[in-house]
Amino acid sequence: MEDCLHTSSENLSKLVSWAHSHGTICSLIPNLKHLLSEGSHGNLTAMWGCSAGHAYHWPLTATCRAGSQERVCFQDNRSFNSDSPSIIGVPSETQTSPVERYPGRPVKAKLDCNRTRDSCDFSYCSEPSELDEAVEEYEDENTLFDMVCESSVTDEDSDFEPQTQRPQSIARKRPGIVPSSIHSSSQGQMVDECSNDVIIKKIKQEIPEDYYIVANAELTGGVDGPALSLTQMAKPKPQTHAGPSCVGSAKLIPHVTSAINTELDPHILSASPSVISRPIIPKTARVSLASPNRGPPGAHGTAHQVTMQMPVSTSHPNKQISIPLSALQLPGQDEQVASEEFLPHLPSQVSSCEVALSPSVNTEPEVSSSQQQPPAAPTITTEATAQCIPAYSTKLNKFPVFNINDDLNGLCTSAVSPNTTKATRYALNVWRYWCMTNGLKDHTDITKIPAVKLNELLENFYVTVKKSDGSDFLATSLHAIRRGLDRILKNAGVGFSITSSTFSSSTKKLKEKLWVLSKAGMSGARSRNIVYFSLSDEEEMWQAGCLGDDSPITLLSTVVKYNSQYLNMRTLQEHADLMYGDIELLKDPQNQPYFARTDSVKRESRSGSTRVCHGKIYHEHSRGHKQCPYCLLYKYMYIHRPPTQMEAKSPFYLTARKEATDMGSVWYEEQRMGLRSLRGIVPNLARKVKLENCENFTFVSFTQVSRRLGSHSCCQ
């Protein structure tokens, strides 16, 4: 037994850690069961275990590394039964063929592990025939874990029986844990000390309800309920063509049956959906079928080598990650706290592992549920979850995101700008969340609410709507939500707008709320140290082509510039509220045409109001027609504008078309320009001429230029 002392401190630490973990789940004291035969490199492997079936294979040397050979490991097959001594680490020199040992039986498939953190390391050596082949090397054995203890605190005597009602799958194993816990079998094989006979011994089976480990989990959810979305999960590779070597999605799920002596055949691994009682969610597991020529000569052409891998990242699929033993979450420690904190309403029927791998509706750059789950896999839904879990997510520090497939999602889609689509869907989610949290689930579809009833709801909505954390929205955000809801109604063709006079009472409530938010410092307006453009800056803009009528963007930027200068429009709100009918083409007493901002659309709601001119734009040809404010505004309003957007109540600023070719005379879409795009026009002009502090330039930055030019703008 002196050879047992020839081991590394790391391996000794692993043995002590396993013994400690074993003591938390089993009252039996483990001891040294077997001293397995030497491998081709002269190292030994000791098997520690107890009479309950808990086993640990302990390498006795630290110098003998895997090098250029392939290791033997258990496959996660609950009905696994093999007579091959290579499974338990017996070297090939002392092994006899399964056909010789058991006549009449077909040759069993040899299981083989590539370099992956899932390997169980039952033997550090292999046949001499494999040593000369160029395969991946195990450079750091510290990243490999040798624990194969397959039980938990919740194990009962019934766990020793075949689990016919509890099919196991590779994908439902706990991600990011000790790899040896992933590879287990319902039967362990041990070599007797006094004979070469193979002893079949049942090992306690682990069920997902026992415990799970989540490394970096965040609370998400969907229609089917909350879920723990793993942030370090990798996208499973699509299944490729069948061949000697292929990597595919882990759809090979073994089904646990009562037939313990079932032959190890590749056909067993493909389970039919009809016999799967629980959904198959191949979140991270994948199967590699290695080339037959990499195995020993005796197994060439007959034995398929299967490897279970748990990739951590798509960029380095073979890179191993060392997980400290202190990070292990033992049963009964943190699981209960996490479940009580994040999943208070989760039914007990749903296992913790299923919750950890259920599809998420998170829209951040993680693996989508369609990529994580095959089309044939059923969704985890029960009547209990449908009754107690709302149909929206509860992601931490994020506003709820609904995943309801209805016609409203199509109404939010914009073919012009993805930002508009995002803002419209956000407004829809805010409305739905407000309705569901205020007992108004029948009114979540805003397009089916009559105008009078909707006006009453909006009066309460503008005053009481809040974020998911209970705080108020900024004034600009609340205004954008209103525009998003109005956009949905317009796309649905309901025949009314929430900005019309029919909704005057709700509009009044909105203005009162906006005034309160502004007084509280929650207007949302950026506080900037305003910087003014100089004459040289403006001249550089013209020369650089940033201003003019050469493209839809330049013409729109020029119109914004002149409206700010000559029509006294100084804030984003004034530009955003501007309607087509608010600017009129008039004539003065000298019969000179000019454009004036009269706000005629806003005056319709004011009885007895007289026309007030907030500014005028005359012809100015001192610098030519290319820079005339009157001519450029005329082109924007009457030449390059869609005919359907020339009504008085049409929005003034429209989204510019991005395709410069084949536009014809119409340069703009039939859609209002977004607030973000409108706000960024002036900073973008400053950025194009390479000015500093571009974000400090606003619509007011053009004021001094207009005074120096001596414009025709005036107020009456």
From Swiss-Prot:
InterPro entries: DUF3504, KIAA1958. The modification Phosphoserine is found at residue 97. It comes from the Eukaryota. Keywords: Isopeptide bond, Phosphoprotein, Ubl conjugation. There is a cross-link at residues 201, 204, 237, 283, 626 (Glycyl lysine isopeptide (Lys-Gly) (interchain with G-Cter in SUMO2)). Residues 84-103, 153-189 are annotated as: Disordered. This is Uncharacterized protein KIAA1958 homolog.
